[in-house]
């Protein structure tokens, strides 16, 4: 498996990303324009994992931001195709994102969220050293 930071997205690659987002959530859809924005912004980075045939089988997004307390980042949308789950690919994607943040200095604190139902993912994040916070997460469509 090869993991890299995506800089452009062909139609075929967009369809593969669309399939991955379907694995992550049945209520979310991939948006070609938004993918283009993610790839063009300096504060967002899409990491993809390709198998030996060049098919995208996993991905994660890193979003960087600066607030008065410092440079922070969130890791979002860590997802691997079902047939590739349990192979360590999710860990490798998160490690690649963390290595990027460390090497660029874009963030000194990283957060992520995961649904409680994603038992294996939550166990992975704890094993990697992420600490579960006692907090509520609120969202609002604007």
What are these regions (language model features)?
Residues 26-46:
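Active-site rim helix/loop that mediates acceptor-substrate recognition in acyltransferases
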Residues 91, 103, 116-134, 140:
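Conserved active-site alpha-helix within GNAT-family acetyltransferase domains
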Residues 44, 70, 75, 133:
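Short coil/loop residues immediately preceding or within conserved phosphate-binding loops
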Residues 48, 55-64, 74, 79:
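Conserved beta-strand in the GNAT
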């Amino acid at each position: 498996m090869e993991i890299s930071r995506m800089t452009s997205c062909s139609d075929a690659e967009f369809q593969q990303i669309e399939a991955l987002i379907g694995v992550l959530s049945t209520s979310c859809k991939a948006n070609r324009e938004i993918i283009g924005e993610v790839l063009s912004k300096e504060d967002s980075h899409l990491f993809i994992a390709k198998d030996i045939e060049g098919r995208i089988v996993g991905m994660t997004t890193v979003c960087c931001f600066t607030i008065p307390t410092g440079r922070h980042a969130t890791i979002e949308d860590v997802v691997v195709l079902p047939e590739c789950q349990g192979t360590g690919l999710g860990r490798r994607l998160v490690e690649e994102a963390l290595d990027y943040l460390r090497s660029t200095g874009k963030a000194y604190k990283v957060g992520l969220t995961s649904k409680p139902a994603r038992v294996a993912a939550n166990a992975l994040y704890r094993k990697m050293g992420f600490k579960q916070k006692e907090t509520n997460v609120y969202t609002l469509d604007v």
